[in-house]
Curated annotation (Swiss-Prot):
Binding site for substrate: 88, 94-97, 175
EC number: 2.7.1.33
Predominant location category: cytoplasm
A Gene Ontology biological process term: coenzyme A biosynthetic process
Keywords: ATP-binding, Coenzyme A biosynthesis, Cytoplasm, Kinase, Metal-binding, Nucleotide-binding, Potassium, Transferase
Cofactor entry: NH4(+); K(+)
Transmembrane segments: none
Organism: Porphyromonas gingivalis (strain ATCC BAA-308 / W83)
Protein name in UniProt: Type III pantothenate kinase
Protein residues bound to ATP: 8-15, 120
């Protein structure tokens, strides 16, 4: 029996999970610097273990809260041991990317994995069936592609992807439709190419999709995938259990 606190500090928000016996019990979203809000959230509880991870500079107040509310705690850093072998410069690997691949490997061991995290950027991570992180690629995300076409051209309008149907014409009949079709078909083709490369490998394989745009992207790509929206949190919990 274990009751763990997982604090994942992003660039603009903080995600907090209560994990009981390796299952996520609840998830809370806190604003940027989560200090006081985090203190109120965890005050009624006493945790067995806790982990704090940040994609940027750590919040010292949040770190202190995490340390104080659990019997044992871990501050995620570039030297933190993980249950994978890495073929990547650890100093340049974001904590969220690393946690995602650890989470995927814990869910699907002995499997060739492609982990796709679809947020502001889209990351493609490869994990071998032997538990080796083979590396990854970073590409512009869905919203970023639309925004770049608007910002770096003279007259192209900004398209809001939130209202776009998954059924996109092959070719647009207006500038708006042309932008939409170009971005969506281009991104779908990019993702399908990575998936095809994975499935060309021998043995069991799986594609794991996570991130804010995961549900939409799942509808526009032709290949079978598994959606795990809380993959980073699961990975951080696995790293915590591995170390403490």
């Amino acid at each position: 029996m274990s009751f763990n606190l997982i604090v994942d500090q992003g660039n603009s928000a903080c995600k907090v999970a209560f994990v009981r016996n390796n299952s996520i019990e609840s998830i809370s979203f806190l604003p940027g610097k989560a200090g006081q809000a985090l203190s109120h959230l965890v005050a009624p509880h006493r945790f067995d273990k806790a982990i704090y991870s940040s994609v940027g500079l750590p919040d010292e107040e949040a770190e202190a809260i995490v340390r104080s509310c659990a019997a044992a705690s871990l501050m995620m850093g570039t030297e933190t041991p993980v249950p994978l072998r890495l073929q990547y410069d650890r100093r340049t690997l974001g904590a969220d990317r690393l946690a995602a691949v650890v989470g995927a490997h814990s869910l699907y061991p002995n499997t060739e994995l492609l982990v796709i995290d679809a947020g502001t950027a889209i990351t493609y991570e490869r994990v071998s069936a032997e538990g080796i992180y083979l590396g990854g690629n970073i590409s512009p995300g869905l919203h970023l592609r639309f925004k770049a076409l608007h910002l770096f051209t003279g007259r192209l309008p900004l398209i809001d992807p939130s209202g776009i149907s998954p059924k996109i014409a092959e070719y647009g009949s207006s500038t708006e439709e042309a932008i939409t079709a170009g971005v969506i078909h281009g991104l779908a083709g990019e993702i399908d190419r990575y998936i095809d490369d994975l499935h060309a490998k021998e043995g069991r394989s799986a594609v794991i999709l996570t991130g804010g745009d995961a549900n939409y992207l799942a509808r526009i790509i032709r290949s079978g995938i598994l959606i795990h929206p809380d993959l980073v949190l699961l990975g951080l919990n696995r790293i915590l259990e591995y170390n403490v």
